């Protein structure tokens, strides 16, 4: 598997190994992540608009955890910041960070797709 700035190779390899080295199962899990992430980002945007800090926190937490599971540690860190904003109810300044996280998600998605092709 290739190393990418968006993806922690060791984390992805550990996940792959824990799946018994089954590339099809990894592909299924990644597919679910790729389907879920846009909805989570939409939830973040909507919760920001409505000021619903708890919904915001939950969506950020989900993205943080799921991203970390696949080795997207930069994205996970961004989502951790967003989660903390939701936890404290301080959503000012969240919009640019959401956009940055969406950009990082796209980078990570490309890196994960490339890694999957090589295993």
Where are these regions (language model features)?
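Two-component system phosphorelay core
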Residues: 1-119
């Amino acid at each position: 598997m290739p190393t990418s700035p968006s993806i922690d190779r060791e984390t992805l390899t550990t996940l792959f190994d824990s799946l018994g080295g089954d590339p099809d199962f990894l592909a299924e899990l990644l597919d679910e992540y790729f389907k879920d992430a846009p909805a989570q980002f939409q939830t973040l945007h909507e919760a920001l608009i409505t000021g619903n800090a708890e919904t915001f926190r939950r969506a950020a937490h989900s993205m943080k955890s799921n991203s970390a599971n696949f080795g997207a540690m930069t994205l996970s860190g961004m989502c951790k910041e967003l989660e903390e904003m939701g936890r404290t109810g301080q959503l000012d300044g969240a919009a640019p960070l959401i956009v940055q996280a969406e950009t990082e998600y796209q980078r990570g998605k490309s890196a994960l797709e490339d890694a999957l092709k090589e295993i």
